[in-house]
Amino acid sequence: MPNHVKFFSIMVDDTARAIAFYEAVFGWTFEDWGPPGFYLIRGAGLEGSLHKRQEPLTGTGFRAFEITVGVDDVDAIAARVVKAGGVVTMPKMRIETVGSLIYFNDTEANRVGAMTYDAAYEAART
């Protein structure tokens, strides 16, 4: 498929802390790869990386890109986020005919969305 997202990167201050967070929240695994502090993200057909931020993060809120992860149970993810040290920044919001969405900050102050899509919405997209 042309023009689709093929690879993404999560920039972090503390790689060990961030890896522990994403393992706990989404069950992703990480493979040490390439330069020091650079990890490939594995899980559910993902192609991504997690690595040390090259410069300090400034500001708050959305910083350019937003990634939303499709999940089976957005309430369970919200609980895992808090347990793993993240902060839910927008509680569950229902988007009619689409699904339920939360936003959270990970342990590295990155803003992430998690959404449980309605079955009818998913079926219409396939």
Where is each model-derived feature located?
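N-terminal first-folded block
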Residues: 7-43
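A generic "binding-loop/recognition-motif" signal
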Residues: 15, 37, 46, 74, ...
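N-terminal beta-strand motif that seeds the catalytic metal site of vicinal oxygen chelate
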Residues: 1-20, 46-47, 64-69, 116-126
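Vicinal oxygen chelate
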Residues: 5-13, 56-126
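Conserved short beta-strand elements that form part of the metal-binding/catalytic scaffold
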Residues: 28-62, 111-117
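Short linear motifs in intrinsically disordered
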Residues: 27-32, 70, 91-94
